[in-house]
């Protein structure tokens, strides 16, 4: 009966915790509760003035465009794959036994725990000896991805039940593997890591370390179905520690490490073994989902086993690598632009490998796409595109311009790729309906049963500029999507009381299959519905012919050239002439556009009993349409 006491005590503690909404009591000194007293993070994401550790500490890296060789692993008989040490072991070899006898070991307060900064080989030797004498230890790594091509481990934190260690990786780079490799591989020693997916492959890549017998607290939190899976949440939930995560993305290459960063690094592992204890108890008492499934504890070890079985693979450049750059698949690029993207991706990959920099540091994706869309062919144009300091681009302006020009000449080869990208995009429909909005100016007015059918625009080609969202139903090039939105037309009364009822118009289709070269795209909207481009729609209804609706669209985009302005003004003048003599007592049919960026769509209903005025309006509207078609034809030449 004595052996059941710890488990019974654990269950009672957890029940009390659930009832009182409190965590298990862990004595934590006031100074341990996060970093609040240290203020905001003083170390930014990137410190450009730092000497690269690869250069300062003579760290050798292999960025050649060849597969990564796991030189310490044996190969399969066919020579096609590497054999991980875990393949000789079973998950069940690591599952805890006799948990009913176990008590969670509460951690000492951070200030009372011995701490060692490992910077010399002798210190590393002492650490290895200390790990030989324990059954489990917690591990975490700090990493830098921005100033190196493959990534660079910057710091290793290790905690036992009694002591915390921080290993200065840079100073001991060539010694980490020889001293720690066998300890991480030892299946009898439990390694506790939170969210180990990346840590596992970083250890393989930089030090040839392969982990066996892992308990991943991140996987455990998922099996336990906790509210959140982050280490920050676990520290608060189980230990009452409010961890400050502002240093999570700090530049960990900095040396010497500030005290506040040392403290942050220690917190990542200091409490982890206690969290591991409590989680095991919870998993042990947790019911299985069904009879066929594994126990929750076994499930965590299976997931942890799978995490360890990952093998690092180097990123290789291929002819199609540019297609995997974020934004290419949905960027709606034409053949010339896509060719430039491919050329610049290859250029930055070559530079990044040679100088051991990330491709994002050499040429960020946003700048890459800006260049591809603007297609600068002289240095002055390229320089104007830069929004921030990019050293590699600034040192290689001429080379980049050469890449752009060469890519533009090779654009024809990318036509099939552009078509393939379009074909892959799913087609969706979003509807856009019109509901009338009635405004009174002098006397009351009413409107009912106003319905306008969909106006279809095929926007299957790129537009370089144009008006805001005018088409009520249209295809968006970016994702081969038909979008329909709700538009509320404004019905305005300017004279005596009038009413609009049963107003309807038929479907009007506009072919926007050609590229627009200026802002006078009239019916042609931008490919995306953007919140910052607010489109104003005004609908005015004629009393004499209430089934004619003129929609005036005003886009506040004033980036158009002088030619567009002149042509737009002519169109506005033509519109004025269409309706300069409205019938007596009827509301004004038009309103002079507020800016040059306006257009009119006349939606007609076939009616044989038209009045002379309506017939005149139809003829004038037809002239307007012909003018529009002529303009489109001019732009398509």
Swiss-Prot record:
PROSITE patterns named in the record: HRDC
Every HRDC domain range: 334-414
Residue stretches making up the 3'-5' exonuclease domain: 118-283
UniProt keyword Nucleus, yes or no: yes
Location of the protein in the cell: Nucleus; Nucleus, Nucleoplasm
Record-annotated disulphide pairs: none
Bias type Acidic residues, positions: 553-565, 602-614
Biological processes, Gene Ontology terms: exonucleolytic trimming to generate mature 3'-end of 5.8S rRNA from tricistronic rRNA transcript (SSU-rRNA, 5.8S rRNA, LSU-rRNA); gene silencing by siRNA-directed DNA methylation
Biased composition (Polar residues): 580-598
CDD domains listed in its UniProt record: Rrp6p_like_exo (cd06147)
Keywords, in A-Z order: Nucleus, RNA-mediated gene silencing
Null allele phenotype: No visible phenotype under normal growth conditions. The double mutants rrp6l1 and rrp6l2 have a late flowering phenotype.
NAD keyword on record: no
Superkingdom assignment: Eukaryota
UniProt-annotated stretches for the region Disordered: 553-624
GO MF, one example: 3'-5'-RNA exonuclease activity
Principal cellular location given in the protein's record: nucleus
Pfam families: DNA_pol_A_exo1, HRDC
Matches recorded under PANTHER family: POLYMYOSITIS/SCLERODERMA AUTOANTIGEN-RELATED (PTHR12124), PROTEIN RRP6-LIKE 1 (PTHR12124:SF69)
Function recorded in the entry: Acts as an important epigenetic regulator through multiple silencing mechanisms. Involved in transcriptional gene silencing (TGS). Plays a role for DNA methylation in the RNA-directed DNA methylation (RdDM) pathway. Contributes to the methylation status of the retrotransposon SN1. Required for DNA methylation only at a subset of RdDM target loci. Plays a regulatory role in RdDM through retention of non-coding RNAs (ncRNAs) in normal cells.
Protein name as annotated: Protein RRP6-like 1
Source species: Arabidopsis thaliana
């Amino acid at each position: 009966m004595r052996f059941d006491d710890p488990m019974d005590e654990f269950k009672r503690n957890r029940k009390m915790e659930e009832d009182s909404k409190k965590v298990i009591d862990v004595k934590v000194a006031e100074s341990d509760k996060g970093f609040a007293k240290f203020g905001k993070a003083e170390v930014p994401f990137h410190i450009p003035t730092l000497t690269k550790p690869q250069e300062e500490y003579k760290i050798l890296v292999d960025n050649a465009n060849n597969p990564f060789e796991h030189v310490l692993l044996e190969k399969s008989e066919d020579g096609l794959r590497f054999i991980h040490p875990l393949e000789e072991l079973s998950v069940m070899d690591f599952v805890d036994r006799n948990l009913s006898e176990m008590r969670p070991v509460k951690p000492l307060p951070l200030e009372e725990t011995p701490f060692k900064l490992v910077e010399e080989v002798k210190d590393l030797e002492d650490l290895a000896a200390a790990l030989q004498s324990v059954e489990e230890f917690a591990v975490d790594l700090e990493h830098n991805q921005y100033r190196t091509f493959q990534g660079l481990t910057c710091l290793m934190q290790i905690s036992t039940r009694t002591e915390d260690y921080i290993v200065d990786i840079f100073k001991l780079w060539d010694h980490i593997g020889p001293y720690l490799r066998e300890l991480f591989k030892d299946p009898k020693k439990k390694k506790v890591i939170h969210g180990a997916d990346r840590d596992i492959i970083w250890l393989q890549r930089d030090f040839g370390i392969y982990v066996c017998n892992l308990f991943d607290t991140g996987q455990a939190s998922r099996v336990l179905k906790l509210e959140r899976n982050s280490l920050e949440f676990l520290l608060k939930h189980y230990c009452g520690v409010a961890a400050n995560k502002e240093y999570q993305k700090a530049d960990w290459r900095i040396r010497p490490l500030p005290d506040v960063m040392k403290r942050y690094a220690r917190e990542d592992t200091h409490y982890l073994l206690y969290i591991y204890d409590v989680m095991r108890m919870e998993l042990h008492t947790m019911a299985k989902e069904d009879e066929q499934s594994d126990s929750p504890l076994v499930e965590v070890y299976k997931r942890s086993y799978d995490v360890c079985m990952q093998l690092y693979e180097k990123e290789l450049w291929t002819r199609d690598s540019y297609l995997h750059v974020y934004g290419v698949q949905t960027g709606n690029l034409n053949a010339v632009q896509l060719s430039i993207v491919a050329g610049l991706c290859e250029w930055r990959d070559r530079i990044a490998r040679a100088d051991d920099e990330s491709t994002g540091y050499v040429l960020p994706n946003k700048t890459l796409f800006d260049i591809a869309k603007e297609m600068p062919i002289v240095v002055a144009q390229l320089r104007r595109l830069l929004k921030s300091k990019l050293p590699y681009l600034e040192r290689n302006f001429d080379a980049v311009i050469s890449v752009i020009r060469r890519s533009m000449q090779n654009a024809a080869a990318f036509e099939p790729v552009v078509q393939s990208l379009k074909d892959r995009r799913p087609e969706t429909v979003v509807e856009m309906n019109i509901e009338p909005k009635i405004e009174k100016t002098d006397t009351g007015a009413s409107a009912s049963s106003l319905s306008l059918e969909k106006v279809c625009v095929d926007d299957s080609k790129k537009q370089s500029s144009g008006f805001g969202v005018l088409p009520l139903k249209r295809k968006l090039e970016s994702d081969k999507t038909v979008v329909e939105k709700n538009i509320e037309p404004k019905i305005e009364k300017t004279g005596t009381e009038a009413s609009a009822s049963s107003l309807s118009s038929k479907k009007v289709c506009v072919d926007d299959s050609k590229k627009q070269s200026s802002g006078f795209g009239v019916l042609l909207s931008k490919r995306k519905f953007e919140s910052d481009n607010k489109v104003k729609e005004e609908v005015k209804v004629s009393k004499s012919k209430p089934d004619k609706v003129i929609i005036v669209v005003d886009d506040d985009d004033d980036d158009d050239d002088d030619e567009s302005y002149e042509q737009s003004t002519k169109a506005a003048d033509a519109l004025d002439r269409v309706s300069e003599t409205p019938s007596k007592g009827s509301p004004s049919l038009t309103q002079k556009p507020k800016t040059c960026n306006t257009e009119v769509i006349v939606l007609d209903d076939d009616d044989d009993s038209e009045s002379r005025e309506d017939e005149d309006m139809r003829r004038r509207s037809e002239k307007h349409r012909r003018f529009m078609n002529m303009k489109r034809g001019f732009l398509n030449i």
